[in-house]
């Protein structure tokens, strides 16, 4: 009897921990070395969840380059049934595909442009939305759950107002809605938190430029992601059940209007 109880309990633990979270993103999310002044918000996510987090975000990548460089295939090879894949992209998708190997076409349509890359190869480049839809489809094909997340804001101020509208975040939201998958409005909660600090204090979290945070700033962006999950407007996030007591203790930024 004792053996049966121990076996059953162990089985429950394995079952509960079987699913994991994988992250596809860029330098705002990626892990940095211990001696680096910068850090990405994905580094801290496991501190607030009861799931293992595999942060596969890579510096400088867009949806297009993440796929083209084989990083997406590597992520998929590590993705199992019932896993959760968070996709937060957009910072590096902006630009002209004719001159940048990472830029995508703006928007979410089916437009394409044929370009010659810096390696001399011919490539058909799609819209940001097209690449997101591909990622969504690939994750679903693995029996896993894709979650689209709005990108964290840059530290751009006009007087005392932090920029809150980011076209690629809006595009990501539109793709998620049209695809019937979950969207986490990380952008809104990141903006709300840094707006509450004002421009001078907010700048202290961006030591090198207006995009990349230090370690404290990264933790704040993780906490704003957790708040966005907890306060999701349209239904309950699949991640909600996995927020641990540390995550549940986060109170700022407060719930934002839907």
Language-model segment annotations:
Residues 1-19:
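Fungal secretory targeting signals
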Residues 13-16, 48-50, 141, 178:
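Short, well-ordered coil/turn elements that cap or connect secondary structure elements
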Residues 225-258:
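Charge-patterned, long linear interaction tracts outside catalytic cores
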